[in-house]
Each structure stands twice: as C-alpha cells, then as structure tokens.
A protein has these predicted regions:
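The conserved beta1-alpha1 loop
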Residues: 310-312, 470
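Beta-propeller blade signature
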Residues: 2-6, 49-60, 105-109, 148-157, ...
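A flexible loop/linker signature enriched in serine peptidases of the S9 family
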Residues: 15-21, 26-28, 36-52, 61, ...
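Blade-edge beta-strand/turn elements of extracellular beta-propeller
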Residues: 4-18, 60-72, 105-117, 161-171, ...
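Hydrophobic beta-strand anchors of alpha/beta hydrolase catalytic cores
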Residues: 305-309, 337, 466
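Non-catalytic accessory segments flanking enzyme active sites
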Residues: 51, 77-96, 100-135, 141, ...
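Active-site-proximal cap/loop segments of hydrolase catalytic domains
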Residues: 326, 332-333, 339-532
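A conserved hydrophobic secondary-structure block that centers on an alpha-helix together
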Residues: 1-24, 28-33, 185, 190
Length: 532
C-alpha cells in the first residue's frame, strides 16, 4: 500500500507505505492511520491475517506505531477504522473471531474500548444515529425475539447505554431474503431477493420508520444499488444485468425516474436464447431453484451440450450476470447454460446457508445432483452431454460431483479447488473456513471425510473426463489440492487433464489475456467431450 496524492497524481514522497501482506491501512486523519499487517513473528492469525492493529503517525517508522488492539491466537482477522461522518466522528475496532462471528468495539478518545454488545453472529453496521443488525441467529432483545435473516435497527447511543428498543426493517419469508442495503443522506435502501430476483425498497428513518416507493427500479435480472454520497445526497447508483443483457449503469435521485448513464458493450448475439427459472426437488424434498439459458429453438431431445455451474457456500448467492466468455464460448454456439442456487449459498438468507454447513454439507451436493437430474428429466440434455464447472468452494463441489455422482456427467472442470479436506485447514487461509466445513483435526473428521474428494476417490470407479486448473500464485486455496488429485487420478489411469497458471492468484489469471486463455481451455475441453 502506497500513499497517493490525488492533486499531483503522484505517490507521496516518504508517505505511508505498507509492504505486501494481507491487511490494510485506513485513515484516521491526514497524518494518522490505522495499520493492520504482518508486523513480524506472532502478528498473524493461524489463517494468515493480521492479529494486531496499530495507530501510526506520519513521519514515524511503522515500528513506532502504537498497538490499539491485539486479538487472540485463534482469531481470524483484526482491523480498525474511523467514521468520518461530520458530527458522528468515532472509531471502531473489529475482531473477527471466525468467518461468521465477530466483535465490534467503540474506541474512546483515551484509547478505551467499549463493546457493541450485539450478537457475535450478527453483521453490525453503524450509520449516524443508527445501529443496524443483520441477524444470522434468533436474537432476544427488549422482550422480543427477532428471526434469523431479519434486519433490525435502534438508536446507537441508546443501545450503548443499555436500551434495547429495536425496529424490524426487514423480516424474511419462505421465498425472500435480504441481499443488502445502502444508506443515503436521508433514507435506507433495501435490496431484497424474492426467489433470486431483486426488488428494491426505500425506508425513511425515524421513531416510526416509513416505507417510500422506489420509482423506476430496474426489473431485469440482477440489480445492484449503492449510494452516490451518503453524507450529502439521496442519489443512488443502479446496476442491472442478466445472462443476455450487458450491465447498465443508472443514477437515480430517490423518488425520481433513473437516468441511464451507460451500458457495457454487447459481446455476443443473445437474440436466439431465452432465460428461464426452474425448481428441482432435492433428496430431502427441498425445492432448489436454478436458472436456465437455452436456445429458443431447443429440440428437447436430450442431446444439447449443457453446462451446469455452481458454488453453494459461504452465504454467497449465484445470480444472473452477463459474461462475454460464456456468451461467445458457450451460448452463441448453441450450448445450454444452467446456474444452480443450491443450499450453502445466500439465495434465501442464513437459513439456506446454514442448511449445508459442516455435517450437513452433503445437502449442497444433493441439491446440485437433483438439478442435474432435472435437466435430464426435462429432456434438455443427458449425462453424456452434461458438463459441470465450479471454482474454489465450487471446486470442492466439483470434486464431490466427480467422486460421488460420476454417472451424472460427461465432463467436469474443477477450478482452484479444495479437495484434500484433511489438510485444508493447514494450507494458506484454510483455517479461516473451519466455520464452514469443520475442523479436520477433531472428531469433525468423521463427517468431513464424507465430502473430501481426495479421500473419496476410488481407482476402481469410472470417472468422467476431468480438467483441473489452478494457479501457482494462489494465496488462498493452495494449488496442492489440485496437484494431489491430478496425480492420484493420473496414476490410476483416469481421463484427466491439468493446467497450472504460474501467476494470477485465486482468480487463476493475472490479466485479460490469461483469463481468455483459461476460458478458451475450459470451453474447448467441454465442447470436445459433450458434443460427441
């Protein structure tokens, strides 16, 4: 991290500088920053993230910075920041204990820390007068119980004084969840997903929060919203996209029709395709949604080369989006594309995510297999014409499709994957994911082994053609996962291919040329296998 002067357009001589490491700098004032980084031995968590945050004055060496907070050895991440909002200037320290648990502290002028005594599992936000909690678990406060997935608000100062009078701003239903929210000068805009389709709502803060219509909200695909300036304006940026429509950027003053500013270029002809949403029935009876992009003239004879993509983890939602790579490499050539919304993701809020945690991880894989079956039942494709792709946690998903459901697929692309779940917590950032998968060094291994592809591999089984891709420079998921699995399958004489880019980090590619190469590699492999 280097300090940059926006006026002179040059790096500041002898300015704040942080060597390459996980962490960051955040401004307190012009001459003071919070710094959280690798300070040397003992300063990082077991996940490789900062465990210490310091206050650093301009003109002094980093070694002279004053420690503000030091976490415990088993913590995941420590950071701090300053709220610059006029009239609400204050400092916060955040202690991330595990992936879904953190503590927030208000830092006093004397350096003292007062805990914001909200549930560790809740996502906490402070804006001007308000404390907003996004709940992952039931929360009892002020004689009421608030549901997981709810967004609740209260006066921040009153909360710190011990009062617990919350207002429910959003409560989930069976088919809706909160995708996010953004503040403007006078309003709070909620981005709600209803069966994985975005809807925007506007709230006016006060003793009695009131709803205000969002005029002219985009109605296609995936919608994003962000404040232009939450201190001085009620304008918001709006983005809208789907599988066949490039992202459009608009600006809207709340209460007025949005003005379209620009759109990304069109990279492929989508006029011959149609977007649908279907629901598959998983093993336990759960209805699992997925999106389908298919040719309008599809024959429905089970022969269409079809690519099923998924992730299913960390409460991350898979939503429609425009991709030139998918369009040119797959759709424009007549391929069918399906995007799975399996459990483990965030499509229906915390309950959808938590349904596939740890010992229940198998439900995510059962969901994905059910979608594969549904595609066949609808006569869109058949196993020999059905391919699947996923990366990172989605690479773990692919590994389980490979080892547990090999008969359902004709080809599998496994990208930057986790595969050896006995060792994952000891490799790079792996320890930070134990809240998702469990700790393999404890009795958790009894269920983790059931979704560890490296340990599920059976040399006597037939497996579909497989392509592994990874990056030597991946600093999140170690390339050893892909390397070991490749070696195991190759030694057993399986139909397997491997490509390791020597740079690119967890994204797998360092620039557009490398990204294009990786996409071309994957789609060429899939066409070769699925169009037979």
């Amino acid at each position: 991290t280097r300090e940059f002067d926006l006026t002179t357009k040059q790096f500041v001589k002898d300015g704040f500088f942080r060597a390459e490491a996980k962490g960051g700098l955040s401004w307190i004032d012009r001459d003071t920053v919070y710094v959280y980084t690798d300070f040397g031995k003992g300063s990082l968590t077991s996940s490789g993230y900062p465990n210490i945050v310091k206050e650093w004055k301009r003109g002094t060496p980093m070694s002279a910075a004053k420690t503000v907070y030091e976490g415990k050895p088993g913590d995941m991440y420590i950071a701090a920041g300053h709220d610059h909002t006029p009239g609400y200037e204050r400092d916060f320290v955040n202690r991330t204990i595990a992936f879904y648990n953190d503590e927030l502290y208000l830092r006093g002028a004397d350096g003292s820390l007062a805990k914001v005594d909200a549930p560790n599992s809740a996502q906490k936000g402070v804006h001007k007068d308000w404390l907003v909690l996004e709940l992952r678990e039931p929360y009892e406060a002020g004689g009421k119980t608030y549901k997981p997935g709810s967004l609740i608000a209260t006066d921040f100062n009153a909360f710190m004084a011990g009062k617990r009078a919350f207002t429910t701003l959003f409560e989930p239903t069976d088919n809706s969840s909160l995708a996010g929210y953004t503040w403007t000068k006078d309003y709070l805009v909620l981005n709600v997903m209803e069966d994985v389709k975005n809807r925007l709502f506007v709230l006016k803060p006060g003793k009695m929060w009131s709803k205000v219509p969002f005029v002219g909200a985009p109605t296609i695909g995936t919608v994003g919203v962000g404040a232009v300036d939450d201190e001085d304006s009620n304008a918001v940026w709006l983005t809208a996209t789907d599988f066949l429509t490039p992202t459009t950027l608009s600006i809207a003053e709340l209460g007025k029709q949005p003005d379209v500013l620009k759109s990304n270029p069109v990279f492929f002809d989508g006029s011959k395709s149609v977007i649908e949403q279907h629901f598959a029935t998983s093993k336990d009876g759960t209805k699992v949604p997925y999106f389908l992009v298919r040719p309008k003239a599809l024959a429905f004879d089970g022969t269409a080369p079809t690519l099923l993509y998924g992730y299913g983890g960390f409460e991350i939602s898979m939503t429609p989006g425009y991709s030139g790579g998918i369009g040119k490499g797959w759709l424009e050539k007549g391929g069918v594309y399906a995007l799975a919304n399996i459990r483990g993701g965030g499509e229906y809020g915390p309950r959808w995510h938590q349904a596939a945690l740890k010992a229940n991880r198998h439900k995510a894989y059962e969901d994905f297999a059910a979608i594969a079956d549904d595609l066949v039942a609808r006569k869109i494709t058949s196993p020999k014409h059905l391919g699947t792709m996923g990366g990172s946690n989605g690479g773990l998903l692919m590994g389980n499709m490979l080892t547990q459901y090999p008969e359902k697929f004709g080809a599998i692309v496994v990208q930057v994957p986790l595969l050896d779940m006995k060792r994952y917590s000891h490799l790079l950032a792996g320890a930070s994911w134990m809240a998702e998968y469990g700790d393999p060094d404890t009795s958790d291994w009894s269920f983790i082994r059931g979704f560890s592809p490296y340990h599920l591999f059976d040399a006597k089984k037939h497996y579909p053609a497989t392509l592994f891709t990874t990056s030597t420079k991946d600093d999140r998921v170690h390339p050893a996962h892909a390397r070991k699995m490749m070696a195991l399958m190759e030694a057993a004489g399986k139909d397997v291919r491997y490509y390791e880019n020597i740079e690119g980090g967890h994204g797998g590619a360092a620039n557009n040329a490398q990204s294009a190469h990786m996409n071309a590699l994957a789609y060429t492999f899939l066409w070769q296998q699925l169009a037979k």
